[in-house]
Amino acid sequence: MQQQPSGQQSAPTSPYAPVDQSGVTLDGLDIGEVVAEIHSQGYAVVEEFVGAEVIEPIREAFNTEVPITEMRFLGSTTGNTWRAHNLLAKTRAIDELLLDPRLRAIVEGVIGKYHQINIATLFNTLPGEFKQDLHQDDGLWPIPRPHPSFLCNLLIAFDD
């Protein structure tokens, strides 16, 4: 038990619990607000999170270093979505993005400080592709709902 200033005791906090990011601001981004939005609606949109100085080297690496393949499996039959898996094994261009302190703080606010990158994938969705409905990517794990968050996805749109 932890001792509170008033003398009351509270239950110990799990080291795996999400980090309270209330009032935390990094580089002008209110981390607590973003995390609260994720907890409230399941996602948050952060406009202009990444600037051109980060995007351009990644785009260049995707055009020169990373083999991209057509994705006719995994739900797409049009041939209008191309995909590259295991980006961390293929390029160092995304390191800066994945180590961004704002991103790490958001993830810690959602799933806790003990997290790891499991998958880094590129999607190139071309004109004519069917829209994909919002969905949760935790279906691979047969855990009954509701359950604590154990997955936090990031999607960065390079183009409008």
Regions found by a protein language model. Give the residues of each.
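Non-heme Fe(II)-dependent double-stranded beta-helix
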Residues: Q2-Q41, V46-P146
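Short, conserved beta-strand element in jelly-roll/cupin
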Residues: P144-D160
